[in-house]
């Protein structure tokens, strides 16, 4: 059989999606990849498929886009897991979805690890309000916190994480290190010193030993901001150790055998270059990579007809039609002694199997004589048929060129990373916006074609 573009060489390692999500030891699946490759849809489709196969699933999206909620029929996602209605729960599974609310997660940590008075002082602190709303790195750290909270909750046995686009998708891996550097930095130690020393000694230390430093900081930051930061650091002092401990624990959780990273990419050069970066970064961080999901792969139901043959046939039809136009200009309109050569060309293409006027498919067909109505093709529609056939052949040639380019790009990645299991997802004809579409993606995720398969992937 001739393989089309959605097939993989049989010797390539295969990513068995159903085996991955059915395994009770798989507790966390992290989908990462560049933007615009269908990562959010993939995460949602995995969640739906796992739930309908009996897992209790929660899908956590860190991406601020609302596509996940829309596809699952939820009006809006927030920091609380919402159950997705319409999922087949006959196998005992269920599906929840949520979107990380960075500030709310930070507030919950403060409220859960400080007494009421200290929590109120922290939450009302202007510096804290700015930090929790958008300080660089806060989102990634809060993602680590939320993931740790979900994993500690026995309500779900599978967590699917949809990460932000581009290389920032793996920034949460650096959150514990960045947090440790922040807490151990000179700036924080300076601000924490008065609180640690306490009383008059603390004031003396601040007034004598740090007067030059605080004067400089006041000029740079403003006196009120410096006081806000000092108040915040003093109130958070007892909580800093807990932040680091939990972040380190979640980092180790991501390295554990129960976690699986899926790199999602499209069959395009830039997307697969990013995928290669993710693969190498995960290996460096000793994170368990399950494989690559190659999304939105195009196929053809007539892969036997090469781009070259299709273009040659289209050019022949176009040239013949031009000749007929010139001939018609000097021929009496009533003279119908011979069929125009355009009609003969169309019939010839049908005879050798390049064009099927009846079925509308291009490709290899059983050779045979022209249809009994061939002689009737003297009508003006013969030119229209030739023009249509030429256009379809050109479209087919363009599709086959896209397929060839996608295959070359894919093969370049697999040659560089032969150890990475791959599954290819055939492109759907339209966008996914409901559970039915997510189920269709889930089916294609699990299909995993090889070069021994022969299938039409176009809907």
Predicted regions located by residue number:
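Short beta-strand "acidic-cap" motif of Rossmann-like dinucleotide-binding folds
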Residues: 57-61, 160, 292
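Phosphate/Mg2+-binding loops and adjacent switch elements
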Residues: 117-264, 268, 274-277
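Extreme N-terminal, non-catalytic leader segments
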Residues: 1-37, 44-58, 62-83, 245-248, ...
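Conserved catalytic network of the ASCE P-loop NTPase/AAA+ motor domain
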Residues: 22-23, 50-52, 88-91, 150-154, ...
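N-terminal phosphate/diphosphate-binding loop that engages ATP/GTP or pyrophosphate donors
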Residues: 47-124, 169
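C-terminal lobe/tail of nucleotide-utilizing enzymes
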Residues: 1-22, 218-234, 244-262, 268-459
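Conserved beta-strand scaffold positions in the cores of enzyme catalytic domains, especially
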Residues: 28, 59, 97, 422-424
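Switch/connector loops and helix/strand junctions flanking conserved nucleotide-binding motifs
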Residues: 66-71, 105-109, 167-171, 272-273, ...
